[in-house]
Design a protein with these regions (language model features):
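Residue-level signal for threonine
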Residues: 6, 80-82
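Alpha-helical residues within the helix-turn-helix
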Residues: 30, 53-54
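Exposed loop/turn and edge beta-strand positions of beta-sandwich/beta-sheet ligand-binding modules
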Residues: 73
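Beta-hairpin "wing" of winged helix-turn-helix
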Residues: 55-70
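N-terminal helix-turn-helix DNA-binding core of bacterial DNA-binding proteins
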Residues: 2-44
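Basic amphipathic alpha-helical segments that dock to polyanions
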Residues: 45-52
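Amphipathic alpha-helical dimerization/coiled-coil segments
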Residues: 82-109
Length: 109
């Protein structure tokens, strides 16, 4: 599978990195909304999380079932070294593209 990242995949990985060890679906969605103003649907989130796990860019583990969740367990996510390296490569690519652009009124042309 490709180790390149789409924009939303990068956003998801960055949100998980920001949240640390306690990153789970709802907290990841909330972090993305807080930081980007974007409100990902649960379907888009979990499809992306599953794809990133298939690409070995993150791992997941099941927490303990809780009464507050009706006996269901949370699925926690952690970015792997492969995922971190992919984010760094993607950000470097963006930086390379931005280099040399002239700023007009504070925005890139």
């Amino acid at each position: 599978m490709s180790d390149s990242l789409g924009e939303f995949e990068q956003i998801v990985l960055l949100a998980i990195l920001r949240l640390g060890e306690d990153a789970y679906g709802a907290s990841i969605r909330a972090e993305i909304e807080k930081c980007t103003g974007r409100e990902p649907t649960p379907g888009a989130m979990y499809t992306t999380l599953d794809r990133l796990e298939q690409k070995s860019m993150l791992t997941s583990r099941m927490g303990e079932p809780t009464a507050e969740r009706g006996g269901r367990a949370k699925r926690f996510f952690k970015v792997t070294k492969t995922g971190t390296a992919a984010v760094v490569r993607a950000q470097r690519s963006y930086q390379n593209l931005l280099e040399g652009l002239k700023l007009i009124g504070g925005a890139h042309a």
